[in-house]
Amino acid sequence: MYYLPSSCLVLFLFFSLFYHLPCASSKQTLGWCESQFQCGNITAGFPFWGGNRPEVCGHPLLELHCLDNITSLTISDHLYHVLSINHTYNTLRVARTDFLQSICLSPFPFANATLPPEIFDILPTYKSVTLYRCYPVIPDLARYGCPAIGSVSVSDNLENPVSCEARFTVNIPTSFVPNEKRLNITSLVRDVRNGFEVRLRIDENSCQECSSSHKYCGFTGTLPLETKCRPLNLPTRLSSEAKIATIAGVSLLPFLVLTLVVHIIRKQKTSNDKGQQDLKEHIPKPRIKALIQLKQYSYEQVKRITNSFAEVVGRGGFGIVYRGTLSDGRMVAVKVLKDLKGNNGEDFINEVASMSQTSHVNIVTLLGFCSEGYKRAIIYEFMENGSLDKFISSKKSSTMDWRELYGIALGVARGLEYLHHGCRTRIVHFDIKPQNVLLDDNLSPKVSDFGLAKLCERKESILSLMDTRGTIGYIAPEVFSRVYGSVSHKSDVYSYGMLVLDIIGARNKTSTEDTTSSTSSMYFPEWIYKDLEKGDNGRLIVNRSEEDEIAKKMTLVGLWCIQPWPLDRPAMNRVVEMMEGNLDALEVPPRPVLQCSVVPHLDSSWISEENSISSEI
């Protein structure tokens, strides 16, 4: 015999008993339209609906939502904040939510939004301007400096120049004149955040007649806001069938509701237990304890935090990073991992378990995680200045002060020292590179992206790897060739050394001035020794002795760290001492003898993507 599941049986009884009840009281919903939508300082009636106003009370496309006392409205698949509503003139001021944080993003993540002309008219006090990214720059267009992009061009006309590869349109006051505010992005951002005003195309006379006849205004179609009058009150008498259905439904309502609630709670608990069990099957016991202590978010909460994943700030090999805001107003970065069906989420487990055991000024702070089936996300603090690789390019690094570069290198060293020697469980990162070093407002570095990390007891000095991991150019020789010894925390030391040489510009010089050298030079810059003998410190010619001392110290530390043999490299606590100590105490490290197998075959199966996860302005 076939048995209905308990949930189906309960629902069947529920809908059977209440079949006549909606028919008996459907007209009563019309009385609910007297109520107003309330959210923060926004009060709205017809043609809006939402909250305690059912859909019948408004236009299908004008549903208002309230979250944290902020009213929002979806127009043409774009979310807008409703800043104000003027019922006298049927106008409202709206602002696109994806413009509220910043319009200086690379690449442009924005798409043009079209307002339905049957419903909205933009007030004549506003106009549309188009923002472009043009290569080469068009001289006739006003340009504004953006930290993450370089420059943005603005035009009043909507013609698309051929050389402009990215564009989107914003609505701003007609008083805005691009040429008069040249190079001042602040005024443009302010005008965009203040939103723009639109008028609803409502037949005001018809609605006034409804009010005078003690009726309320309704709509007749889906797109045009054609109105008609509807009664506010119910008929006073119900049929006997309706009365019986109503009494029966009301009598059994508490029992059915209680049954449904108990069933849902049991089902949800079973589902959660199964999901947690699936996760725990692949996590060692020490890591489970670390996960339990973290705040766990539901996937719906993650969607609210990221405003339905509105703003992308970074992309990498393991997922996409979105900008988000917690309920207390804190800005966060939310990394949503890619489909994990094939690897049981080991990258997710590595990152969460590793970051959950850290607390250091130079390690990015983990705030929580989400794990619902194959939907997994990591929430951590947001770094306004993005990743280090954007600051050590040939153009930007030449303008940075040597003390700033030294502070960044020292901060990363302290962070790695903490991972190797300061944690209860030693953490080896395995993917130290500029893209995985984030910078806060004060250019203080924080190590991030622990997707390839491994945890081991501090007494263990050797790690066993089933696969080679890291990014080409930063991988220690022993990781892909056991000729050089065993893999250990010294592998991070090598990656740090290459990072330091990147900071002082050594990698750029290698690619431009040493193209005729052997392929092994991409792992060990042989030419640096020659420059040290000549007195050149590898980045630029400095005039002050203090800067010259900093440059030489960073160069020597970098060379010690990238020694091919792990035993010849200093541990990270010794690296910090070298960075903080006197230059005179540092010796020039011996020139290494590289083995032929130092350059591996570039197999994508073990190379992490270069575009790792990072946040941007």
Curated annotation (Swiss-Prot):
It catalyses: L-seryl-[protein] + ATP = O-phospho-L-seryl-[protein] + ADP + H(+); L-threonyl-[protein] + ATP = O-phospho-L-threonyl-[protein] + ADP + H(+). It is a single-pass type I membrane protein. SUPFAM superfamilies: Protein kinase-like (PK-like). Keywords: ATP-binding, Glycoprotein, Kinase, Membrane, Nucleotide-binding, Phosphoprotein, Receptor, Serine/threonine-protein kinase, Signal, Transferase, Transmembrane, Transmembrane helix. Its EC number is 2.7.11.1. It holds the Pfam family WAK_assoc. Residues 1-26 form the signal peptide. It comes from the Eukaryota. The active site is at 431 (proton acceptor). This is LEAF RUST 10 DISEASE-RESISTANCE LOCUS RECEPTOR-LIKE PROTEIN KINASE-like 2.4. It comes from Arabidopsis thaliana (Mouse-ear cress). The gene is LRK10L-2.4.
